[in-house]
Amino acid sequence: MSTVAGPSTPAGTDERLMRTSPLRRLLGRPELGSVVGAAAVFIFFSIIADSFLRASSLGTVLYAASTIGIMAAPVALLMIGGEFDLSAGVLVTSSALVSSMFSYQMTANVWVGVFVSLLVTLAVGAFNGFMLTRTKLPSFIITLGTFLMLTGLNLGFTKLISGTVSTKAIGDMEGFDSARKVFASQWTIGGVEFKVTILWWAVLVAIATWILLRTRFGNWIFAVGGEADAARAVGVPVIRTKIGLYLGVAFAAWVSGQHLLFSFDVVQSGEGVGNELIYIIAAVIGGCLITGGYGSAIGSAVGAFIFGMTSKGIVYAEWNPDWFKFFLGAMLLLATLLNAWVRKRAEATK
């Protein structure tokens, strides 16, 4: 009996061992479209606004980007996991309100209020994750309900405790100055002021990127976002993963809330409404798919940077700020189309 051997494969050319070409690797990066968009926005405002290129403008743009980017990074991870959080914007305000009102009413060290706020904020995140995994309802419905409840609680408790829609000043209380150094300080480098939120942003993006690319939990995130049932079938802890993602969003909301409080000393109970959409937009511009299973934390940072350049570029160009929402919507559409095109090109090169 004879056998017919197939064509031999030269040593070192096994398809499984072949290195991916640089072009294929580049096209496969989720943030590619956002990087192109960021370059276009930078060039655009550099041409029409002379002050945009000043060194002092860099700190302003980065600060605007960081206030969005701190939240956009965990929101991006949540979207990669196939879920949304429409309560993220008001949760930032809730975090600030709890810290302020607890410290003021209990006449306690401000750090006690900050710690209580962390527990409350994480509890809200756990609630979102628990309700999502137990009820099987869409995250849109679950977090929309949380959004409405928090909006009412923020206003109702603030009026009940302080008698107005804003909190009382706590700037003279023990622990305020040290907390401000952690959450709302700034430093000067080369005559340019940089806010500490930029550092928080960089650290959170670095951690999120490490989780996605270097840990088992990162693999779980992509798996549950791609196909939760299939992921569950191969042993991925879907429930634990999704609750963990909501806890990540809650932690970032706590950081942002403390910055809000210690920057202005008082907090308006109606703040934060609508910001959840900006976080989602930054993640989508950065390459995250609405359907889940695809995206990156670095892309969310680029998306937030585009937000910062646009929001401040319009001011430097002396345009009416009302145009900002138009540009934001246009960038969302263009980024989505560009990301779809990049993905098709990446698939075509496989």
Name each region found by the language model:
Residues 139-215, 243-244, 264-272, 347-350:
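Transmembrane helix-bundle core of multi-pass membrane transporters
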Residues 41-106, 130-137, 283-298, 330:
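Single transmembrane alpha-helix segments in multi-pass membrane proteins
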Residues 108-117, 123-128, 190-267:
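Helix-loop-helix "hairpin" substructures at the membrane interface of multi-pass membrane proteins
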Residues 31-36, 61, 69, 90-94, ...:
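Hydrophobic alpha-helical transmembrane segments
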